[in-house]
Amino acid sequence: MGALKLVFVTGNANKLREVKKILSTDVSSEDSLKIEVDSKALDLPEVQGSTQDVAREKSRAAAKLIGGPCITEDTALCFKAMGGLPGPYIKWFLEKLGLDGLNKMLQGFSSTEATALCTFAYCEPGKEPILFEGATEGNIVPARGPTNFGWDPIFEVSGTGMTYAEMPAEQKNSLSHRSKALDKLRQHFSRR
């Protein structure tokens, strides 16, 4: 099977590196679809809503701007004790509160459970986006590991005893919310 080339609309170098790594190493057989990713950074409007709403609108706008098919991503970190917040607003919560502040949000609650959610959207100009979602369960903990990739140091994956930041890249990429969403994307294009 040949290679599919996709444009990933992101300005986040860490996300791009991780997506390329996941898609280049997660090929289970010679017949599996290989996906090559290029990136383009665009200033897209950030709509408010669910990760699905955000991913749909970002991908529509991006496909129109670049004049071709593309993928976009929206990520959420949903605290069970807070009914799913900060959810898709995690980027702004992290910028304003920092890792320690996110932990403090859960003080007084009995649960530190959280879901990491990733929604990729594939869109061609003038067409409806196709969504691919992945989720990983875990808990919010005091920061452990390198602090150079968003909220990775405070999200401890259930059953591992480690935060995303503490894991070797191969381990994180085998069980992360992002890898689960990308696996669904790969399956979709493998069936085409």
Swiss-Prot record:
Q: Which residues of this UniProt protein bind ITP?
A: 10-15, 58, 74-75, 91, 149-152, 172, 177-178
Q: What is its main location?
A: cytoplasm
Q: What is its EC number?
A: 3.6.1.66
Ligand binding (Mg(2+)): 46
Q: Name one GO biological process term.
A: nucleoside triphosphate catabolic process
GO CC aspect terms? cytoplasm; nucleus
Intracellular or extracellular location(s): Cytoplasm; Nucleus
In Pfam terms, one family for this protein is Ham1p_like
Judged by the first EC level, this protein's enzyme class is hydrolase
Recall the GO molecular function terms of this protein's record: dITP diphosphatase activity; ITP diphosphatase activity; metal ion binding; nucleoside triphosphate diphosphatase activity; nucleotide binding; XTP diphosphatase activity
Question: Which superkingdom does the taxonomy of this entry point to?
Answer: Eukaryota
Q: Which SUPFAM superfamilies match?
A: ITPase-like
What reaction is this protein's catalytic activity? ITP + H2O = IMP + diphosphate + H(+); dITP + H2O = dIMP + diphosphate + H(+); XTP + H2O = XMP + diphosphate + H(+)
Alphabetical UniProt keywords: Cytoplasm, Hydrolase, Magnesium, Manganese, Metal-binding, Nucleotide metabolism, Nucleotide-binding, Nucleus
Instruction: Tell me how the cofactor is bound.
Output: Binds 1 divalent metal cation per subunit; can use either Mg(2+) or Mn(2+).
The UniProt similarity line reads: Belongs to the HAM1 NTPase family.
Recorded hits in HAMAP family, A to Z, give: HAM1_NTPase (MF_03148)
Query: What name appears for this protein in its UniProt entry?
Result: Inosine triphosphate pyrophosphatase
